[in-house]
Amino acid sequence: MPDAILRLALPSPLRRLFDYRAPAGVRREQLQPGMRLRVPFGRREMIGILVEVTDTSEVPAEKLKPALALLDSTSPLPPALFKLCLWTAQYYQHSLGDTLNWALPVLLRQGELAEARQERFWSIAPGASVDDPRVARAPRQREALTTLAQHPHGVAHQLLSKLMLSKDSLDLLLAKGLVQVEIRRHAPGVRHEHWLAQPELPLNSEQRAAYEAIRAGFDSYHAFLLAGVTGSGKTEVYLQLIRETLEAGKQALVLIPEINLGPQTLARFEQRFNARIALLHSAVNDRERLEAWLAARDGEADIIIGTRSALFTPMKNPGLIIIDEEHDGSYKQQEGLRYHARDLALVRARQENIPIVLGSATPSLESLHNAYTGRYGLLRLNERAGGAKQPRFLRLDVKSRPLDSGISGPMQQAIGQTLANGQQVLVFLNRRGFAPTLLCHDCGWMSECSRCDARMTVHQRYGELRCHHCGNVERTPRQCPKCSKVDLRPVGAGTERAEERLAILFPDYPVLRVDRDSTSRKDAMNQLFATIQKGQPCILVGTQMLAKGHHFPRVTLVSILDADGGLFSGDFRASERMAQLIVQVAGRAGRAEEPGKVIIQTHLADHPLLVQLTEQGYFAFAEQALSERRAAGLPPFAHLALLRAEAHKPGQAEGFLDEACSEAERLLAELNLSGIELLGPVPAPMERRAGRYRAQLLLQATARAPLHRLLASWMLALEQMPSGRAVRWSLDVDPVDLY
C-alpha cells in the first residue's frame, strides 16, 4: 500500500490544501478528518487540520515533508461541525484553513490538548446534615459544611480559599464521612449556580399558540420567525421551549447580539433552570472558553449562550437553536471570515435536523420575506405580556425651535414631568462623545482626522479629539491650528454633552450615561443596570446599547433626540435600520403597569416613513419597504457580493478593481452566465480610512447559483493577479454594510 498522503487545511488566507506525509509512527487507520497536526511551513511551524487522507499528490514524493506530530487521538471537531465549516468556506469563498481555525477556541489553535481538565471537587456527603452532632462544637467545620450545602454541585479544590474553606476542616469532615471528594471535569466557563426562584409564567393565547407550533416541529428541521412586539413575552416562549428541549435530554444554543446582554440573559436562565449553562463571548478568557466549548461538545453543558462566534460551539445532543434579536447587525462578522451568524445558524439547524427560532420585534426584511414566502413559519405576538400597553408616539417638530445641547423646550418639560411623577426617562442619542466636531468660530476650521475622511469627535471629559473610525486620538487644541485664534466651539451634541446638560437642568436626579465609553470598565454595565433597576427616578442617556433587549420597568418616557439621520443615507438599508432602532428604543417605555410615551425630535415630522412607522407600526413600514426593494431589484429580491480593496497610494485600489472587473466580465462570457450586474468600481463612501484609500466593486445578481459559480472561478483568478499584491482586498458575500 502506498504511503498515506495527508491533505491539510492551514490557517492562512490561501484557499488551497497542503500535502504532507504522515508523522513517523502514525498509521493510516489512526487518522480522521478534523484532527490537528503540527507541520513545518517554510521557516516556521503551523497547526493544520486534516481534511482527507489520499494516496496521490501533485507534489513529487521526494518534496513532500512529513508532519511533525499528530495532536489528537480523535477529532476535536464533531462531524456535523466539520461539515458546517466546509459549507461555510465554500459559500463565503474563504480559506478552509482559516474557517476551521475560526471554529476552534484559541488554545486549540495553539496546540493545547482537546481534553477537559480534571479537578478535585468537594461536596456534602449524601444524607449528611449541618446539624450533625459531630460538628456541634466545631464551628469552623460546621461553617464549612454549611458552605458546601449551599453548593450542591460541589466546590472545585482551587476555589476553596475564595469561599474561605479551610483544607484542614474539610479533611476532618472527610474523616467523619460528612463530605466527599470526587475527581471530575473542571469547566470554569460553565455555570452550576441556580437560584430556581422564578416559576414558569402562564402563557397568553398568542404565546401558547407560538409555543405549540414550534413544539410540534421539534422532531426535525423547522425554521420559525417569532415576530413579537417589544415586551410581548418572546423570552418566556424561549424559556419554555428550552425546558422542553432539556427534558428530552438535548442541548439548546441561544445566540444574543451583544456581550452586554449576556449577564441578564444568564441571570434569567439561572433563575429558571437547574441546568449547566455555558456563556461564550469575547470577554470570556481563553481557558474558560476552551473548557465551556469542550463541555458543550461532550454533553456536559445543557444550555449554551453566546454572541456571534458561539455558533461554532459543538453540541453532543443538539436539540434547539434560538437567535434572539435576529435583525441585529452584530450577527454579521465584518473582518476575516465575513459570515452571518443568523444565516449560518439556519444552515446548521438544517444539517443537524433540529428546529431553529428567529426572534425579533423588528424582523429583518430578509427574514420577513422568507416568512411571507413560506420558508419560515411566521408566529406573531401582537400584545404585550401582562396587559402592558403599547407606548404612544409623538413626533415633535423642532424646525425653528432653539435646541439646548440638542434638547428642545417641550422635551425638557416632558422629562421634568416624568421625573416629578417618580418615573424614569430614557434619552436616546446614537452619537458617542461630547460633540461630533470642533469648529473655529473665526476661520471655520473643523477638527478632521489626519488618517480618514471624517471629523474628529470631541470627548471633553478626557480633553481629547477621537476618530470613531480609526481610533486616532489627539489632545484638544487650545487655539485654532489654522488661524491661532482661541474661539473653538463644539458643534452638535453627543451623549456626553446631553449627560452634562441634563445634569444641570435636573440637578435633583441621577443622570446615567450608557455607551461604549462609559461601560468600558469591567462590570460597569452591571453596576449601571443595578442602579436603574432600583426604580428610583433617574435619566438614562445612551446610544443603541440601550435599545437591545434590556428591561427597564420604571421607564415611561423615551426621548429620541435626533431621528433624521437614517432618512438621508446612500445605503439602501438605512431606513430599515432607522425603523428598527426607533421601534426597539421605543420598546423600553411602559413595559410594566405604567403606560409609556415616546417623543421623537425631528425636522421632518411629516416624512412618510416616520408617519407610517409611528402611526401604523413596524410591519406596515416593512411591507412598504419590501415593495420598494422588489421594484428596485435589491435584497431580499437580489443577491450581492462586494469586492473591497484598499491601498496606501491613491489609485492603486481602483486599478486592482478595474482589472478584477475586466476578469469578471471575461468569466461571465466564458461561463455563459446571465442576470449578474457589475456596479463600479467606485470609491468607498469614506474613501480614506486609517491612512488607506478604499474602493469597491459590487456584484448584483437575480439568482444565487450563477453568482456563486462566478465567484468560485473569479476568486481563483484574483489570487493570481499581480496587482492584488499591492493592495489589501477582500470579498464580502451577502454584505450588510456597503461602506
Walk through the language-model features, giving the residues of each.
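A short, contiguous, amphipathic alpha-helix enriched in charged residues
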Residues: 5, 17, 32-33, 651-666
